[in-house]
């Protein structure tokens, strides 16, 4: 019963619910794509799963109509990142925040065009939206890789201190941060593969992924981000008095 209560409580969170919908959507696309391509006698089930996947994706698009304000508050609080020690991370984060802020209205316009609310070319807005997502993922991957390398450098030869002389708690915190950055990097790269696939044909491997491969990349990314969230939650519980 306690587990059921915790699950119910977690699902009240928008982030947890979005993460679950995302994972289910990509899992349905993965399984559905495999059934359609590899199992002719189960192709009808596969097509139904692909429809379910599309509906999950549409659900997330509608829910993101309300994310602009939260993103704006975060961007405003970060500002120009004057508190950031690493100037490279600082400007990567500023550019990433601007990209993410522009992503939402572009998606809203594309959605409204598909819904016949606005008379504009939805394909153009979806392309711009995907390009912004691709840039955001690329910036996130570079940021995670840079942070990971800097932390590893500190562990190996921190200024004026040998690695063995670092306090155990600080060393564990740095190792946990490195693990978190690795998960972020891999998750962003998996999403980046899909983002490029959804760009106009002629751009790298755009349009070449079968549905099951899109589902696989998305499922990997979703599982990695879920693992990262669970680790962060446990770390927060451990740090709380």
Curated annotation (Swiss-Prot):
The keyword 4Fe-4S does not apply. InterPro entries: PEX11, PEX11C_met. It is found in: Peroxisome membrane. Residues 1-122, 228-241 are cytoplasmic. It is a multi-pass membrane protein. Keywords: Membrane, Peroxisome, Transmembrane, Transmembrane helix. One of its GO terms (biological process) is regulation of peroxisome size. Residues 150-211 are lumenal. Homodimer. Heterodimer with either PEX11A or PEX11B. Interacts with FIS1. Promotes membrane protrusion and elongation on the peroxisomal surface. This is Peroxisomal membrane protein 11C.
């Amino acid at each position: 019963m306690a587990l059921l209560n915790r699950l119910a409580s977690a699902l009240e969170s928008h982030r947890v619910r979005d993460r679950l919908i995302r994972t289910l959507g990509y899992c349905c696309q993965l399984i559905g794509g495999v059934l359609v391509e590899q199992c002719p006698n189960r192709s009808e089930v596969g097509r139904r799963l692909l429809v379910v996947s599309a509906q999950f994706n549409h659900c997330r698009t509608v829910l993101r109509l309300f994310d602009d304000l939260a993103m704006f508050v975060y961007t405003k609080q970060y500002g120009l990142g004057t508190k950031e020690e690493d100037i490279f991370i600082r400007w990567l984060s500023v550019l990433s925040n601007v990209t993410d802020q522009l992503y939402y209205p572009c998606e809203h316009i594309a959605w409204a065009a598909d819904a016949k609310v606005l008379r504009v070319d939805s394909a153009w807005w979806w392309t711009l939206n995907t390009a912004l997502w691709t840039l955001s993922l690329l910036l996130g991957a570079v940021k995670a890789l840079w942070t990971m390398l800097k932390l590893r450098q500190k562990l190996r030869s921190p200024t004026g201190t040998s690695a063995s002389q670092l306090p155990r708690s600080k060393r564990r915190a740095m190792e946990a941060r490195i693990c978190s950055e690795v998960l972020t990097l891999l998750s962003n790269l998996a999403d980046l593969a899909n983002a490029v696939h959804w760009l106009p044909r002629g751009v790298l491997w755009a349009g070449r992924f079968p549905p099951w491969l899109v589902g696989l990349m998305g499922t990997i990314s979703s599982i990695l981000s879920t693992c990262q969230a669970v680790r962060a939650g446990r770390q927060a519980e451990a740090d709380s008095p």
